[in-house]
Amino acid sequence: MSSPTITVVGAGLAGSEAALAAAKLGVRVRLFEMRPQKMTPAHRTANFAELVCSTSLGGEGEMQSKGLLQAEMRSVGAAIVTSADASRVPAGNALAVDRDAFSAHVTEQVKNHPLIEVVEGEVETVPDGICVIASGPLTADALASDLRRLTGSERLSFYDAAAPVIDVDSIDMDIAWRAGRYDQSADYINCPFTKEEYLAFFEALETARSHTPHDWEKLEFFEGCMPIEEIARRGVDTPRFGPMSPKGLDDPKTGRWPYAVAQLRQEDAEGRMWSLVGFQTGLKWGDQKAVVQLIPGLHNADIVRYGVMHRNTYLNAPEVLDSTLQLRADPQKLVAGVLAGTEGYLESSATGWLAGTNAARLALGLEPLTPPAESMLGGLVRYLASANPKGFQPMNVNWALVPELPTEINEKTGKPKKLGKREKRPPLFRRGLGAFMAWAGQDAGVPVTPPAVPEHPQDELPAIR
């Protein structure tokens, strides 16, 4: 008897994860990807799961909400996190990867799987039968229009951007230095500004922004991947209280925090390419170079990849999705990734894993499932299905998505004990991971292996990509 077959549209992070998750359950998959026949404004290769913005999948460890989601995905052997682990580069307490090695690793897994058939070409209408739609933030107009018809929902969009990448040999290390915040690592290159240098940089950034064709007042951005020029538009000090914050970075020449700092993070395993952290941009390339070379230590910067800005597309998830990621209008259709209203690589891949697992269960005659509320994936998909649809915007994981710990009463005062982050988060992490693994092994019926958990005592990392 032949295995049942499902369709997956899109071979990004969510689609690749969905295809591999379904195939792991013994279901055949037809995976459609329009690249390289039709490229997007943001992609540059034909590889699957190409990272078009940052190379970070977020902070690790018990203090991090993304750390819990990483651990959940590691426990079920999810492809994106295991590929990230196999291609990781030094990034302090974050899980960052070599961009090309990562996508090559995912592509190899997908193309070599005997149950996955890759079909090159654009999908213009929602396929018949059981299907995972993971066409991503750059969903082609024809498919987006058919999705709108199917769901009755207006298509929403926001703007996203990538940061410039610098050749390490062009960085002046007599000015810059390597360190992490509060000496937690030496995985970042830091470029220090005096007040005068910062104000000159800011003025050039403002002038460059005025050269772009964008009507900045009308563009919607997601806060976690906002262009540096849009951050600057909000005020002269906004960048240095955001991605250019000097907190925890002692300049070895002065022993003090600089007025502002531009940080660079390693992009590749060899350490030859470094991206400017939080410097996503849509500036014209000539202006980008001029602005970047005003950063102390980058006066001779060789930009090997310029930043770009593009539009992202997503559905109003609370109006159209159940927590199983099935469309309410057609339960045989599931949606994953940015299109489902998630923000972030890790979130996209995790919803891909759930959508692929549930699509396979449907094909096998089983009921689709929702992970427990205590788990980070369960909290995320419950939010997508139940948030206020008015003004809905994509969501990344955070601790507010999972239930609070049971309240303990202070015996002396008779009042509830107030717990700090360091007291609350490790128990939330352990509770969530335990609940997820029990659910995955018992209810979902997938193999589970307890993951190693990095012990990083720091607070939640800022949402800077």
Swiss-Prot record:
The family this protein is said to belong to: Belongs to the MnmG family. TrmFO subfamily.
PROSITE patterns: GIDA_2 (PS01281)
Pfam family, one: GIDA
GO molecular function: flavin adenine dinucleotide binding; tRNA (uracil(54)-C5)-methyltransferase activity, 5,10-methylenetetrahydrofolate-dependent
NCBIfam families xrefs: gid_trmFO (TIGR00137), PRK05335.1 (NF003739)
EC number: 2.1.1.74
Example of a GO biological process term: tRNA wobble uridine modification
Chief localisation class: cytoplasm
Identification of the protein by name: Methylenetetrahydrofolate--tRNA-(uracil-5-)-methyltransferase TrmFO
Gene3D superfamilies: FAD/NAD(P)-binding domain
